[in-house]
Amino acid sequence: DVQMIQSPSSLSASLGDIVTMTCQASQGTSINLNWFQQKPGKAPKLLIYGASNLEDGVPSRFSGSRYGTDFTLTISSLEDEDMATYFCLQHSYLPYTFGGGTKLEIKR
């Protein structure tokens, strides 16, 4: 199975900060990767598909990039509403696998 190693598991940042989180695939050369945001009690929301494509309606402060088997989600200017858990999903190889998640908190 392809393991998705996500880091950090949690982070705290201030409003306006640039925030990054990463997922590294344990193997595979043509990984198709999505990034999701999940808030407590809510269904996951798709942010980025195909590693770097912004889903319709998602603010442009979110962006995704890829370098080999390393994938990065960046939030360019942190807002209060961004407090959530973020996770990646690879859906190129069965079984599809998720990263462990990054819990993002706002530093007060």
Curated annotation (Swiss-Prot):
A UniProt-annotated Pfam family: V-set
Domain of life: Eukaryota
Residue ranges, annotated region (Framework-4): 98-108
Coiled-coil regions listed: none
A single GO cellular-component term on record: immunoglobulin complex
Segments of this protein annotated with the region Framework-3: 57-88
Keyword entries, A-Z: Adaptive immunity, Disulfide bond, Immunity, Immunoglobulin
Disulphide bridges: 23-88
Matching PROSITE patterns: IG_LIKE
Region of interest (Framework-2), residue spans: 35-49
Region Complementarity-determining-1, residue ranges: 24-34
Residue numbers spanned by region Complementarity-determining-3: 89-97
Residue ranges of the region described as Complementarity-determining-2: 50-56
Stretches the record annotates as Framework-1: 1-23
A GO biological process held by the record: immune response
Other information: This chain was isolated from myeloma proteins that bind beta(2-1)-fructofuranosyl moieties (inulin).
Name of protein: Ig kappa chain V-V region J606
